[in-house]
């Protein structure tokens, strides 16, 4: 018996989406079908998080995003944000937030939108900052 969380994502073409994601992130393939478009699925992990891509199939009630970006993002902590960001842009992803160095918080962030309608926050931690320290910094910013 398995327990855990799996993120299921409906896209226009699961096989194409997986090819793109594996070229940008470190992935581990679990299973992948090779059926006619509309019937495929790919299960894989990105840094240990299980993701399940499914082809859009309106007859089965599975709709991929259309012309709008879904208001949820996947936050991926990567070892080299500049390289990952460049790969995403090179694959036609749209920059929503540029590389932003938040050195006081110990991170560099960026947000990109993939060509399938989903947002990805890229996140590189370069210094461990405790919750208490981050909270105090936010409170100080709110007081200023």
Tell what function each PLM region has.
Residues 1-8, 25-79, 85-113, 124-144:
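Vicinal oxygen chelate
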């Amino acid at each position: 018996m398995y327990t855990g969380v799996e993120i299921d994502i409906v896209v226009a073409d699961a096989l194409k989406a997986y090819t793109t994601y594996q070229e940008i992130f470190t992935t581990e393939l679990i299973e992948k079908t090779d059926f006619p478009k509309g019937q495929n699925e790919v299960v894989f992990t990105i840094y240990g998080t299980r993701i399940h891509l499914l082809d859009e199939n309106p007859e089965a009630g599975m709709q991929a995003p259309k012309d709008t970006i879904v208001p949820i993002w996947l936050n991926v902590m990567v070892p080299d944000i500049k390289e990952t960001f460049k790969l995403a842009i090179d694959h036609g992803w749209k920059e929503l937030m540029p590389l932003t160095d938040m050195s006081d918080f110990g991170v560099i962030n960026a947000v990109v939108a993939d060509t399938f309608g989903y947002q990805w926050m890229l996140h590189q931690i370069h210094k461990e900052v405790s919750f208490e320290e981050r909270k105090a910094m936010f409170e100080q910013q709110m007081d200023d």
